[in-house]
């Protein structure tokens, strides 16, 4: 086996780079594409349905479900990035004394995740995530020993599906 055989095994001729990506959630504005530091494409799961027959089990396909989606966001001094998620979450369920909440058509949004080739211009994969809304706007860590770092926080979003 030669090194060339390894690279030939990948039809595009190159490996995907996990650091060449952008996340666009148009509801949060253009700047979010630069504030989203990390994410993963959410898992799609088809549960199995075990069916027993005469001491044997066969597995049939069940329903498709989708895991929640988590993004890591770089915070800014004005806390605008985090506040946008808090405000979005408040559309689904308010934080005050009153019980408030919008309709799904008001709080469910879409996102696009794009992965790029090494030239950082050619889109190699694009996934659209539908029915998003933030279920958990993560904590902000404060620590006197955290020098030379950018503050980040995680947001977990529920979703309906991706394509």
Curated annotation (Swiss-Prot):
GO molecular function: structural molecule activity
Disulfide pattern: none
Superkingdom of this protein's organism: Viruses
Cellular component GO terms held in the UniProt record: virus tail, tube
Entries under Pfam families matching the protein: Phage_T4_gp19
Biological process (GO), any one: symbiont genome ejection through host cell envelope, contractile tail mechanism
Record's keyword terms, sorted: Late protein, Viral contractile tail ejection system, Viral genome ejection through host cell envelope, Viral penetration into host cytoplasm, Viral tail protein, Viral tail tube protein, Virion, Virus entry into host cell
Localisation: Virion
Functional summary from the UniProt entry: Structural component of the bacteriophage tail which consists of a contractile sheath, a tube and a baseplate. The central cylindrical segment of the tail consists of a rigid tube, composed of multiple copies of the tail tube protein. During infection, contraction of the sheath drives the central tube through the host outer membrane, creating a channel for DNA ejection from the capsid into the host cell.
Family from the record: Belongs to the T4-like viruses Gp19 protein family.
Protein name per UniProt: Tail tube protein gp19
Natural source organism: Enterobacteria phage T6
């Amino acid at each position: 086996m030669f090194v060339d055989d390894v690279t030939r095994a990948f039809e595009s001729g190159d490996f995907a780079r996990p650091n060449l990506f952008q996340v666009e959630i148009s509801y949060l504005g253009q700047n979010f594409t630069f504030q989203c530091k990390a994410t993963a494409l959410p898992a799609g799961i088809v549960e199995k349905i075990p069916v027993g027959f005469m001491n044997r089990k066969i597995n049939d396909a069940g329903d498709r479900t989708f895991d929640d989606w988590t993004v890591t966001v770089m915070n800014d001094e004005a806390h605008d990035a985090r506040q946008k998620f808090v405000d979005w979450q408040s559309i689904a369920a308010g934080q005050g004394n009153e019980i408030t909440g919008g309709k799904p058509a008001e709080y469910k949004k879409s996102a696009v995740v794009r992965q790029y080739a090494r030239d950082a211009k050619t889109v190699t994969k694009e996934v659209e995530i539908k029915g998003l809304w933030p279920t958990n706007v993560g904590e902000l860590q404060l620590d006197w020993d955290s020098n030379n770092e950018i503050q980040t926080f995680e947001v977990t979003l529920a979703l309906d599906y991706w394509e």
